[in-house]
Amino acid sequence: ITGLKEITRKGIGHNLNTRAAAMKYARENNKEYKDCKLIVVHLGGGISVTLQYGGKVADIINDEDGPFAPERAGGLPVQSLIKYFGESGMTTKEMLKKMKSRGGLVAHLGVNDSREVEKMIENGDEHAKLIYDAMALNVARKIGEEAATVAGDIEAIILTGGIAYSEYFT
């Protein structure tokens, strides 16, 4: 449910990957998946944050609504977005492509590979550091948002996807 009856929020975004990671966690901890309360975050070209308990994905902040990512623009201030679209001269198709594959790190830094961004940071690029740190902060905020849904009663936060291997980001 959203603030406009004509627009619904979709429960899409890396569901197979995050569910598999949650089930792996359950197996490794000798638990039933249905008995786990987890937040699972997919950190790839898009970023999604899921709350999983009772044997299902109970809530999701998808890659359209959540933090910006290597390629996704993520959630944006609505009025600014509408104004930008109106003034840009882009078609709806062009705007959707920009949001899905030319946003995030691509829009700010021209690259979609977090390893390249980390090299930029190692080489002293303060702008790259600002953008990458902002992306990490946005992920942390969305994890907190999902945790608040269950009053913080979470047994683990699981990170998956390529960026999950980054010591800098995680």
Regions from the language model: what does each represent?
Residues 55:
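Short acidic-hydrophobic catalytic motif
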Residues 7-35, 45, 58-114, 119:
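Glycine-rich phosphate-binding loop plus the immediately following alpha-helix
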Residues 1-4:
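Short beta-strand-loop/turn "lid" adjacent to the catalytic site in phosphate-handling enzymes
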Residues 32-36, 151-154:
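Short helix-loop-beta connector
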Residues 38-42:
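Short glycine-aspartate micro-motif
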Residues 154-170:
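Glycine-rich phosphate-binding loops at beta-strand->alpha-helix junctions
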Residues 47-52:
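Short beta-strand scaffold segments in enzyme catalytic cores
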Residues 97-152:
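Adenine-nucleotide phosphate-binding core of ATP-dependent small-molecule kinases
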